[in-house]
């Protein structure tokens, strides 16, 4: 996730909460990343010019994890807005393909976590903990 440093406005980002039963998938951002290094984050990335957010999400999951997800039919699960980026977070619980770390230049690990594991993680955004805990409780 690259953050805008010019006056072009906030970068538009899509991310996914991937669920597998009572586990959620997180990606560990490499320590050398300029923005949000060495933290656990949701998979996703930029919405390209003219691209629908749902299409962006499907593309990003293919690029980062090697999976094919259906476009979400529901509205975003959560949104984070800052002066530098606007992030839409979508719930994904069905996909095809074998999940791998296909973006090793961005993430040095991908892993599944249960609710009890989340509190000890350095997460990219403070709202992730309550959001993920609530999702896993349902």
In which residue ranges do the predicted regions lie?
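Conserved Nudix-box catalytic region and its N-terminal flanking loop in Nudix hydrolases
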Residues: 23-63
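Short, charged/polar surface micro-motifs in flexible loops or helix N-caps
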Residues: 19-24, 31-33, 48, 83, ...
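Conserved N-terminal beta-strand and adjoining loop/helix that marks the start
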Residues: 2-25
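A generic structural signal for short hydrophobic patches within well-formed alpha-helices
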Residues: 47, 118-119
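Active-site-adjacent beta-strand/loop module that shapes the phosphate/pyrophosphate-binding cleft
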Residues: 69, 78-100, 109-111, 115-117, ...
């Amino acid at each position: 996730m690259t953050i805008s440093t010019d006056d072009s406005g906030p970068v538009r980002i899509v991310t996914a909460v991937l669920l597998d039963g009572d586990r959620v998938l997180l990606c560990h951002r490499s320590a050398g990343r300029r923005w949000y290094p060495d933290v656990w984050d949701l998979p996703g990335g930029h919405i390209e010019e003219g691209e629908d957010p749902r299409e962006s999400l499907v593309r990003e999951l293919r690029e980062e994890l090697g999976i094919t997800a259906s476009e979400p039919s529901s509205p975003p699960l959560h949104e984070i807005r800052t002066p530098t980026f606007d992030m839409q977070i979508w719930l994904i619980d069905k996909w095809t393909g074998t999940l791998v770390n296909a973006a090793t230049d961005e993430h040095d690990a991908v892993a599944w976590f249960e609710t009890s594991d989340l509190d000890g993680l350095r997460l990219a955004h403070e709202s992730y903990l309550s959001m993920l805990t609530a999702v896993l409780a349902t």
